[in-house]
């Protein structure tokens, strides 16, 4: 039996390499039948079955990868020939040859596709936005083998939708339109070009996946996908739409150096490893909102030419958005930063909003320039804040913000409108040394200070406006308030509660991991302790409140 199959295999491979279209398609069909026969043969060992089928698949893939010179002739894709009669005759002959070659190759891919398709449960089918999990699908009979299509020019439609590539799929360096859906091993798409739409929605990638250096000319959907290992999209260019909505990244995700020509949305995502977006360019509106980052998030050195929506995010690791340029509004409202956050050296062509957020680590928002207003209204800062050397084109507002440690605003410039510090609470001291207020006096109505901390209110020598100070020693801005002795005691009590909750979160994270139920509960307790303090402080800035 083995000798007979070997002879059929060798003859089929010979015919597949040349001959008529009918002979080559027949040879491909023979190889497919041989593979199915080996899989059904229970007499030979599993290792032998796998080896024989992989050998057949390698031969089929080699046929797909083999170059075909006429596919690179752009004129053959025209509707009508050009030139004299001799050239027209050649056009029709070569185009017929090209169509015939495409027919052979499509038949091979169709046979492969039919045997790598996966089936999902009814529940998953009814909810296309739910990321697939391992138990939600069953693989095809050929899913457990490796496929190498690297460097292929797909000059015909390719349909890999609903496919399960269990041992890896290599599509690196390809030019094609491709709709692959489910991968079980390392998948390499690097350096590929997609001239039309590319749909990878609802995919599961069990191994490391490489999409680096790709070019997408049409609409691209990667949303609703699950990446179990490292995924690399770096250096890619996307067309009118790039969607990564509701995806889960179990390991590191690298989107660095990408260019988005049109709208980009990666909202409602979960990043369990590092998330790297460094050096990317967004030419239209961008949504990176409503997402969870378990480890470090790097969004530094990016350029946003449309509206930037980065609100309602949770950053459990360090956050770095330094050196960015925003042409339009940038929204960072209602975010939680559990570690240090940096916006150093960024430029805002419109307004920046970081309101109603919680910053548990140090914040660096220095050496920034803004044309519009900048607001951190209603936010709470648990560690030191650096606002030094900034230029505000309009006003700066920290109204109702709570600063528990020192705030350094020195050597900044506020141009149009008044800087708004109304009802803010500075519990750890603040410096306005060398600040220049150009248009109006800053407003400190019902602002709350801790008289035990250090303060510097001596603005720049050439400042058009000064901070209006009340009489007394120590002296504070007119309209502001200071904590009473009883208030200082309560502040200490609240901070002790926060420190205990933060310590419990740190211990639980080391013990159970970033995203365990115990850690989520500890984060909730820390947030509750922080909100309790903020609510108490804000009650002191209300009219006629005893402190």
PLM-predicted stretches and their roles:
Residues 1-4:
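Transmembrane signal-anchor/signal-peptide helices with a preference for the extracytoplasmic
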Residues 7-14, 19, 25-29, 37-74, ...:
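N-terminal leader/targeting and pre-domain segments
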């Amino acid at each position: 039996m083995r000798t007979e199959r070997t002879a059929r295999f060798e003859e089929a491979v010979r015919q597949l390499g040349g001959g008529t279209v009918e002979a080559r398609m027949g040879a491909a069909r023979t190889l497919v039948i041989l593979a199915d026969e080996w899989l059904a043969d229970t007499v030979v060992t599993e290792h032998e079955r796998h080896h024989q089928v992989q050998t057949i698949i390698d031969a089929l893939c080699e046929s797909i990868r083999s170059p075909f010179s006429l596919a690179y002739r752009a004129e053959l894709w025209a509707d009508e020939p050009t030139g004299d009669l001799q050239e027209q005759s050649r056009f029709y002959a070569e185009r017929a040859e090209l169509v015939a070659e495409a027919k052979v190759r499509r038949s091979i891919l169709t046979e492969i596709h039919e045997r790598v398709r996966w089936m999902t449960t009814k529940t998953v089918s009814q909810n296309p936005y739910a990321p697939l999990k391992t138990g939600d699908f069953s693989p095809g009979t050929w899913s457990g083998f490796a496929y190498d299509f690297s460097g292929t020019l797909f000059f015909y439609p390719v349909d890999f939708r609903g496919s399960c590539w269990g041992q890896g799929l290599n599509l690196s360096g390809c030019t094609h339109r491709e709709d692959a859906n489910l991968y079980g091993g390392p998948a390499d798409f690097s350096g590929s070009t997609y001239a039309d739409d590319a749909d990878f929605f609802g995919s599961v990638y069990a191994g490391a996946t490489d999409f680096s250096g790709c070019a997408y000319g049409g609409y691209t959907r990667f949303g609703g996908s699950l990446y179990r290992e490292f995924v690399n999209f770096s250096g890619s260019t996307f067309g009118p739409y790039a969607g990564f909505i509701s995806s889960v990244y179990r390991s590191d995700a690298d989107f660095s150096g990408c260019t988005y020509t049109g709208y980009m949305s990666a909202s409602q995502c979960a990043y369990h490893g590092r998330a790297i977006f460094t050096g990317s360019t967004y030419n239209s509106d961008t949504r990176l909102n409503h997402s969870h980052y378990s480890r470090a998030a790097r969004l530094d050195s990016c350029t946003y030419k449309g509206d930037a929506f980065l609100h309602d995010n949770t950053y459990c690791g360090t956050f770095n958005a330094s050196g960015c340029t925003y042409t339009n509004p940038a929204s960072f409202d209602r975010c939680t930063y559990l570690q240090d956050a940096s916006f150093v050296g960024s430029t805002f062509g419109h307004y920046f909003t970081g309101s109603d957020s919680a910053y548990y680590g140090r914040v660096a928002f220095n050496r920034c320039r803004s044309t519009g207003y900048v607001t951190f209204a209603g936010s709470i800062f648990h560690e030191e804040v650096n606002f030094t050397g900034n230029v505000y084109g309009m006003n700066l507002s920290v109204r109702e913000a709570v600063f528990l440690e020192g705030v350094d605003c020195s050597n900044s410039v506020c141009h149009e409108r008044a800087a708004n510090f109304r009802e803010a609470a500075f519990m750890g001291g603040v410096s306005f040394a060398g600040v220049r207020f150009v248009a109006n006096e800053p407003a400190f109505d019902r602002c709350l200070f801790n008289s035990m901390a250090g303060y510097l209110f001596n603005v720049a020598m050439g400042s058009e406006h000064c901070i209006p100070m009340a009489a007394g020693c120590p002296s504070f801005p007119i309209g502001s308030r200071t904590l009473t002795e009883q208030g200082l005691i309560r502040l200490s009590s609240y901070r002790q509660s926060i420190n205990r909750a933060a310590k419990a979160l740190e211990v639980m994270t080391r013990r159970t991991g970033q995203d365990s139920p115990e850690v989520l509960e500890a984060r909730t307790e820390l947030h509750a302790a922080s909100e309790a303090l903020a609510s108490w402080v804000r009650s002191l800035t209300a009219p006629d409140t005893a402190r």
